[in-house]
């Protein structure tokens, strides 16, 4: 799709243009493949992945209007793959020269406030959001769950950095299930229903393997600008991975920082234990009412074993192996 084909949300446009543009948007949406997910939401397939109507419009807004800066950093992931943790780590690393440990923004703000979503926040609320009021500047920090193909539409040849984190599919499933039910306040969504949805690929931002593969291939083709991280490696070798992340972001730790415990200080600040214990994350919420505490659960590797049957394990393992065949990637 070329730039001239991308429709715009015209709330801020001239009255006479609004009607035509909204028809263009409707026309695009009606031309896309659609399906219903396990929650009853109608999804549309765009650039390889599924989105609801509002998120799709936000992605189109982003594709049309986003102006990248050379120093931009974008944290990307499939939902419930370690996004909150990676946002905290990336913010702490990239902004560490501006904040001391005593007055650090992570002590009084949730990571999702400090690293806003492009399609779930900024471009969902406005077709042309004011990006001069971001919590971070030079570098600006953003996040996304959209596919790599959708993300790179406005980036073109921009040298901005993209950091992607993937996680074991079975742990993603259980974490997503717990999160969805905590959002509703009821246990209306069964694990079995979400499991079948994930296996079919018809779920928000899915298919999971397409989301992961896009960024995996991007990291192989352009390792200078796309970094592919694994949640499990962040858990087992955090010091190695955070130093790798700092190098990628062009803000490596100095010898003085390492000698003075700078690496461990950031790891402690951003640990799920520390973040979940902060008052802001116990009692605060996003503007749309999502409680901050819903973003923190166990964060353990292998927690899926307490929930999934051997049959579910075998089925999803076979699907993932088939979908990733020949890519060189294992989840």
UniProtKB/Swiss-Prot annotation:
What tissues has this protein been observed in? Expressed in seedlings and roots.
Give the EC number(s) listed in the UniProt record: 2.8.2.-
What keywords are assigned to this protein? Cytoplasm, Transferase
Q: What are the subcellular locations of this protein?
A: Cytoplasm
Extract one GO cellular component term from the record.
cytoplasm
Q: Domain of life of the organism in this record?
A: Eukaryota
Output the Gene Ontology terms for molecular function: sulfotransferase activity
Family affiliation: Belongs to the sulfotransferase 1 family.
Name this polypeptide is given: Cytosolic sulfotransferase 8
The species is Arabidopsis thaliana
